[in-house]
Each structure stands twice: as C-alpha cells, then as structure tokens.
Amino acid sequence: MSRTVLTDITLATLIGFACLFPGCKNNDNDSDTDGTTRPPEPESLNCQIQKSFPHDTSSFTEGLLIYKGGLYESTGDPDYIGRSRLLKIDLNSGKIEKQLNLDRKYFGEGLTILRDTIYQLTYKERTAFVYTLDFKKIKEVPFTTDNGEGWGLTTDGTYLIADDGSSNLYYYEPSTFKLVKKLPVTDAGALGYNLNELEYIDGYIYANQWQLSYILKIDPSNGVVVAKIDLTDIWNRVKQKDPKAEVVNGIAYDPDSKKIYVTGKNWPELFEVQFSK
C-alpha cells in the first residue's frame, strides 16, 4: 500500500475520531465556509390548470384582479398609440363589459381596488389614477419609486403596495400615495429582481417576474421569498397556440371562491390554476 493511501486513511480516521467530540460540525449546504448559515431556498411549487377562459390578445396585461366577482384588467401600450386601458371583463366569455381608454401619453400599469375605489399606476409618467367602480375618474395623484417607474400594484387591505421592476416593494397611504415604507425582497439571501404584477393572497404577496415564467410568493413581514411557482408548462402551451404571445404577467385572486387566475401579455387564454407541491 502506498504512502499516499496510508496517509489518506490515517487522515480520514483522525477526522472521523475528532467528530465524536462536541464542536465538530459538518460543512453542509446550509452553512458557508465562514460558518454562517445561508438562508433556505424557496419551496418549489407547481401550477396546474383547472380551467381555461378566453383572453383578448390585444391586451398587453399589466394589472389583473377580481373584485366582488368582477374581473378587472389594466393594459399597457408599448407603442403609445392609445391602447392603454382600464377594463371590466366577463370572465367566461372574455368580452369587455366596461372600458376606459387612457390618454395615449400614458402607459397603463398595475391595478388594485380598495374599499370600492380603483387605483391604476402608469409606467414612467409618475401618475396614479383613482376611479370609482363605474370608471369615473376621481383624481390623479403623483407617486414616486426609486427609479421613477410604476409596475405592479396590490393592497393588503390597509396600504397600496407597488413595485418598480426592481427588488423593492413600496407601501403607500391610499388617499395621498404618501410613501410609508420600502421593503426589499430577498430570494435565498440575494435581492430579488424584475418584480412585476402583484396580488395579495391569504397574507402573502405574489409577484410575477418580468421575462421569467416564475411567480414569487413573498412574506410581507420580512420580504423573504418563501416559494416559487413555475409556469413554464403554461407558457409553452400558450406559445404553441399563439407564437406572438408575450411574457407571463397577471395574477388574480377571488377571495370568495378561493380561486386563482393567471394570464400574460397578449395571451389568448386566461387560466384558473392551483398551486401545489
């Protein structure tokens, strides 16, 4: 037996013997070399289609929600030719029940409803629109984010919660859009990124990731991503049906039926889905 083999065996024996004593720890995946514990990876969840509904392929979806049984959508307009809209839609048929067109200088973005009042963000115009449920404009309110952009919008029942495509969530006082706090989102210890359309579901914030097929489930108490939902199979199905369909974007939750819906920009379908392990 060579000297090298003997040395290896002796070293292995000594290491094994030393680990019988307190203070000897394995350097596993939960710890870095400096002994600090790494944050856990988010749980991976699947997304199963329960039902499919028609969706207007001209809708560049930026905001999606269900309020008192009604489906509402905010659309953007990359060409700024007057296609940014606020819509109320019949879920089963996909037909528009009510429509408001934004001035073509605005790019429609995130959408939420709080206490019968509709709030709609704009992309780079730093303006939020406030409406009644029948789409009568109440006022325009300036708002601010770190990069000056508005992307997703939701509410926890007290505050309006927005993002700007970065890793940050912004909490606003609803009547004034005064910034209350900023919450950084972290994914396995690293800053999250590309946060887009938002939805608040049973105490968690769900966020699409722009240009990715994931939805992030975020704990609002600390900004930690606790789970990731993979929509790759749904996106592939949509692309096969319509190659012009854009990225995944749009999460809606019906608190009465407990049903979740997802769609994307210019998608031909909107899906009722279920998240599971």
Label the model's feature ranges.
Residues E73-Y80, Y119-E125, A162-S166, A207-Q211, ...:
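Conserved beta-strand positions in repeat-built beta-propeller and related beta-rich domains
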Residues Q50-R85, Q99-T112, W151-G152, G264-P268:
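Beta-strand-rich domains and repeat architectures in extracellular enzymes and scaffolds
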Residues S93-Y123, T127-F129, K137-N147:
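Blade-loop segments of beta-propeller domains
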Residues L20-G23:
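C-terminal motif of bacterial Sec signal peptides marking the signal peptidase cleavage site
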Residues T57-K68, R104-L114, T145-G157, G189-I201, ...:
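Beta-rich, blade/repeat-based domains predominating
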Residues T36-S58, L91-E97:
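A short helix->beta-strand "capping" segment at the edge of beta-propeller domains
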Residues D90-G94, T132-K136, E173-F177, D219-G223, ...:
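Short loop/turn segments that connect beta-strands within beta-propeller blades
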Residues Q50-H55, E97-R104, F143-T144, K182-L191, ...:
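Surface-exposed loop and turn segments in beta-propeller and other repeat-based domains
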